[in-house]
């Protein structure tokens, strides 16, 4: 749908009657996905879907084919709009795929399971104490409000990889 919105906007622009509403819907959706819980803010790449209606908690599985399609979509959106956020997301998604999904033999793995060592999202969530252990006090004070560590956890007993923000408009 987002790809179709971008193509429609590009076609309408070439005809001299740009459909700005189509562009707005595409940009809004892409930004919401990039700042919500399905995008891995630290490692890059997208989780398969969200398990809550605010798009803050991902199902921690990452599929190569989903990320390939999203990489192409964000690259196209960056090219069409000049939006630096879309460019960054495309680059980070490509870097994630090459770093984490490529096998030593040169092929690619199809997915990363949501469960690690018998625990869902084990390597995608953190506690304030775990973050304090690796950051200085000043770094933690900047990091915590951005990633929601100054509030109750958003996933079981820890917090997941979404940018913190106030109430959202539904996507």
Ranges and model annotations:
Residues 1-171:
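Glycan-recognition and catalytic cores of secretory/periplasmic carbohydrate-active enzymes
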């Amino acid at each position: 749908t987002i790809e179709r919105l971008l193509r429609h906007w590009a076609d309408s622009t070439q005809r001299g009657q740009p459909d700005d509403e189509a562009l707005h819907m595409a940009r809004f959706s892409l930004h919401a996905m990039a700042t919500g819980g399905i995008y891995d803010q630290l490692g890059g790449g997208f989780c398969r879907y969200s398990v809550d209606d605010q798009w803050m908690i991902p199902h921690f599985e990452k599929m190569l084919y989903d990320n390939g399609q999203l990489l192409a979509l964000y690259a196209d959106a960056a090219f069409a709009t000049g939006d630096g956020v879309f460019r960054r997301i495309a680059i980070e998604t490509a870097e994630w795929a090459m770093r984490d999904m490529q096998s030593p033999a040169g092929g690619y793995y199809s997915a990363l399971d949501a469960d690690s060592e018998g625990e869902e999202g084990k390597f995608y969530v953190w506690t304030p104490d775990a973050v304090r252990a690796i950051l200085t006090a000043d770094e933690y004070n900047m990091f915590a409000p951005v990633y929601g560590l100054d509030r109750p956890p958003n996933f079981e007993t820890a917090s997941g990889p979404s940018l913190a923000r106030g109430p959202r408009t539904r996507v």
